[in-house]
């Protein structure tokens, strides 16, 4: 619950979900990229009050990344499910769907859902050759070392 935050305003709020029915409901929050959530034992919905900070999106993203790192540190797998700016269907946003499902207070925004559980497989790390060194500039944009 200690994550870097602009001006230490901490606009984020986490909704920890372990109820299987609620997790299944959340797994339907968008047509693609969320269905796997139904098999996870834990979902953490990363929300924020935008009245607290104008950079709530950035602060929530940092906090969510810390959740990923904490999960990995104790041997758990995690996966980000983007909610903000996604659609549940043609008439309802994923965010509105999650807000309704979790009965969030009015004005509370939803950034993402972090699925957490035991990974089915152990994936190898990325090879050093895949690092995108060309996306790093030194001193000025486009300048290589």
Residue ranges and their predicted role:
Residues 1-145:
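Acidic, surface-exposed loops and disordered segments
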